[in-house]
Amino acid sequence: ACATHPPMTKSRKVLVTGGAGYIGSHAVLALKDAGHLPVVVDILTTGFGWAVPDDVPFYEGDISDGDLVARIFHEQGVEAIMHFAGSIIVPESVENPLKYYRNNTANSRSLIESAVTAGVKHFIFSSTAATYGLPEESPVREDTPQIPINPYGLSKLMTEYMLRDVAAVHDFNYCALRYFNVAGADPQGRTGQSTAGATHLIKVAVEAALGKRGHVGVFGTD
């Protein structure tokens, strides 16, 4: 889901939230390889400092800290945001929904407000296919109804709604990426899926094939 998001045709300073995590660290490398200038902010709850290249500015902190984010914008001249920070485990979101509404929804609201205040106009949001819930059609399309069935999906969908509404009234454009099963690693071995106990399907299947876990849990019949 995108709202008038232009291609980055010139080198830009891009703030990558969660840039020490799995997807975020790959985005940092992709930005560098494309000639852009990434800046990372990560609280290192699940990310790793070693995943951030030495030549990339790194701030350890929470995106809900408006003063920190404003300082990053000022010091680095940030022009765009790629927002990967958040919590992603579906069963945990059911057991602890408030954690997800804080980390994924409330913190995203703070980041969006900081961006609007600073005049940062370009925002790419790491959403999730969980916003679709149990879709009645396959393959799923971008305009398939979004009816999440767990707090994780809903916490991400609410952020999409915030971005939509902000873009309608401010000089602000965004794109929301709704992943299904993320897999893979940097071909040069610079980063990869390193989180202990990760729940990504492909990693779980590979670990089962290698004998590192006893089974792969299958949910649903498709």
Protein language model features and the residues they cover:
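N-terminal Rossmann NAD(P)H-binding glycine-rich loop of SDR-like oxidoreductase domains
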Residues: 15-34
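SDR active-site strand-loop-helix element
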Residues: 17, 41, 81-85, 123-128, ...
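Conserved glycine-rich Rossmann-like NAD(P)H-binding loop of the short-chain dehydrogenase/reductase
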Residues: 36-45
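Rossmann-fold cofactor-recognition segment
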Residues: 55-64
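NAD(P)H-binding glycine-rich loop region in Rossmannoid oxidoreductase-like domains
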Residues: 63-103
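Catalytic helix-loop patch of NAD(P)-dependent Rossmann-fold dehydrogenases
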Residues: 95-113, 117, 121-122, 131-176, ...
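Alpha-helical substrate-binding/gating segment
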Residues: 182-185, 203-222
